[in-house]
Every structure is written in structure tokens, then in C-alpha cells.
């Protein structure tokens, strides 16, 4: 399992959690973004910079992803592609996207896009809470533990 990070919009606290997990579990973690992201020195953490453009980083993640890999993203259409390709998708707030929930999440996203297009002010997401940070760390740990057990 590799961990792919949609790093363009990934919160700093999430990246810090990922960096610690990569070194602790010795899991290859690759950040993909259209700008350089500072990463700590580690043999398990890499940065890939792609050209600017709509969904260029997302497309690169999907291209490189193999079944069983984990993608960290808040981008719901990207999460749907990851699941379709046999990967796992986790958002920075600790919500695991699955075959069972991705369609309803996509539908809600599309509904909110329609509302915004018609002039309704929907606001953005709230700042990440401590409980969401903890939920992410816990879910990441569960996924890594499960992978390590299957690998034995």
C-alpha cells in the first residue's frame, strides 16, 4: 500500500499526521500538488509537482494509483475515481469514502453546487476541530494496521 496525498488543499495538520505515520509505519507516502510542498527528510515521503491546471494533480494520482492504495483527499469526484479503481479514499476530517457512501456524498456535493449556482450562499466548511483531527489520525492508524496485518 502506498499513501497518495492530494496535497494542493490538504491541511497542514493532516500532512503532519501523515508524515509521522509514514515514518512510524514505514509506508511510502507521496504528496502530489501543482506547487512545491515542504516535506521533512524521510526515505518514506516524496513530493511530486505537476503542472498547473484543472484536475492535473487528481489525474496524476489516479494514473499512479494501484488497487489497495490509500488516497487522502477532500475532493469527492477524485475519491469516487479512487474507489472505482480499487483504492481507498479518506478525507482529512477522518471520513472514509466507500462504495456504499460515495454516491450519496457525490449527490449532496452536486446539489450544493446547484444551490450555489442559483445564488444561495452555502458557506464553506468549518475549520477542522480537534475531534476531526483525531478521527483522521485514528482512521489512518486503523487502515495502516489492517494493511500491515494483511501483508504478514
From Swiss-Prot:
InterPro entries: UPF0178 (IPR003791). Disulfide bonds: none annotated. Belongs to the UPF0178 family. This is UPF0178 protein swp_1285. It comes from Shewanella piezotolerans (strain WP3 / JCM 13877).
Amino acid at each position: 500500500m502506498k499513501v497518495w496525498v492530494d496535497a494542493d488543499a490538504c491541511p497542514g495538520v493532516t500532512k503532519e499526521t501523515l508524515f509521522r505515520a509514514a515514518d512510524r509505519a514505514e509506508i511510502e507516502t507521496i504528496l502530489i500538488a501543482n506547487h512545491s510542498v515542504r516535506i521533512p527528510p524521510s526515505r518514506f515521503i516524496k513530493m511530486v509537482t505537476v503542472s498547473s491546471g484543472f484536475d492535473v494533480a487528481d489525474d496524476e494520482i489516479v494514473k499512479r494509483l494501484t488497487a489497495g492504495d490509500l488516497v487522502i483527499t477532500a475532493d469527492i469526484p477524485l475519491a469516487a475515481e479512487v474507489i472505482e479503481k480499487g483504492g481507498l479514499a479518506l478525507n482529512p476530517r477522518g471520513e472514509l469514502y466507500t462504495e456504499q457512501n460515495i454516491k450519496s456524498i457525490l449527490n449532496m456535493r452536486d446539489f450544493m453546487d446547484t444551490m450555489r449556482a442559483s445564488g444561495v450562499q452555502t458557506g464553506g466548511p468549518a475549520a477542522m476541530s480537534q475531534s476531526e483531527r483525531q478521527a483522521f489520525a485514528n482512521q489512518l492508524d486503523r487502515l495502516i494496521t489492517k494493511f500491515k496485518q494483511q501483508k504478514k
